[in-house]
């Protein structure tokens, strides 16, 4: 795939960092629910708007010309195509130069909150602090103005939110919980703007503890969120039991690399893997 470059090929080619953007391709790409400036990058997006004449002497030009010579067999065509630039979907965009995704990526922007598109055993909402480009395995969330981000992330990572999202998802065979942007918008979430400053501070503190555990311990976070909702401490055990049964449905499921690119898709076609 020309536009998405894993770290190993990037290093092998020696592709210049100034024409690459870090990409969150899959929840399996990182071990904690935070994309910080120092998070290790496993995939990049080629983001170069320079003409080939301006790229002389660079590894990026060698990479581009390599892909212009490749024989490809796109689905739906009877004959092979020589070069990524001659693929019908690439020619249809009329980008100048053909590999320039910079304008589209700039218009699209990035979101600070990444929901998993499909939920398996593990559920984590990612804070996209570093502003990575998100792939099709995520639903990007742009909070409303004036919504404090860390309290919101605390609520979204809590067990009650996991339950609400799993309930609203379509369940596929094998226990795969598939979320769509439309259904996510209808899931009830605590309006953290309406909480007192003290409550917001409690949520922020609990969320930072959750991050320190690399997303492995949300006990304190759940306690604060249940208290905010006015639910008794005994509710936590019932919640964990119900979530355990839901997660058990996914025990035998292997997480795929990609999802259906036609379902609620807002990604650039070149960044879809199917």
Where are these regions (language model features)?
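Polybasic, glycine- and aromatic-enriched phosphate-binding surface used to engage nucleic acids
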Residues: 1-205
């Amino acid at each position: 795939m020309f536009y998405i470059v894993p770290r190993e090929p990037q290093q092998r080619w020696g592709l210049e960092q100034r024409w690459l953007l870090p990409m969150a391709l899959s929840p399996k790409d990182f071990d904690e629910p935070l994309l910080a400036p120092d998070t290790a990058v496993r995939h990049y997006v080629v983001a170069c708007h320079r003409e080939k004449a301006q790229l002389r002497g660079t590894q990026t030009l060698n990479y581009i010309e390599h892909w212009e010579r490749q024989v490809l067999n796109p689905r739906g065509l009877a004959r092979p195509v020589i070069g990524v630039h001659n693929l019908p979907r690439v020619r249809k965009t009329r980008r100048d130069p053909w590999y320039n995704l910079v304008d589209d990526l700039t218009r699209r922007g990035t979101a600070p909150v990444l929901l998993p598109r499909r939920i398996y055993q593990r559920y984590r909402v990612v804070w996209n602090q570093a502003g990575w480009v998100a792939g099709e395995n995520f639903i990007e969330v742009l909070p409303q103005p004036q919504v404090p981000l860390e309290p919101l992330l605390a609520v979204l990572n809590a067990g009650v939110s996991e339950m609400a999202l799993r309930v609203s998802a379509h369940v596929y065979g094998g226990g795969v919980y598939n979320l769509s942007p439309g259904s996510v918008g209808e899931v009830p979430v605590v309006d953290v703007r309406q909480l007192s400053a003290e409550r917001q501070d409690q949520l922020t503190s609990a969320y930072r503890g959750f991050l320190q555990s690399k997303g492995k311990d949300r006990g304190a976070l759940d306690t604060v969120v249940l208290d905010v909702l006015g639910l008794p401490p005994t509710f936590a055990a019932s919640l964990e039991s119900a979530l355990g049964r839901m997660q058990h449905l996914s025990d035998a499921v292997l997480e795929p690399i990609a999802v259906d690119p036609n379902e609620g898709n807002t990604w650039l076609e070149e960044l879809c893997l199917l």
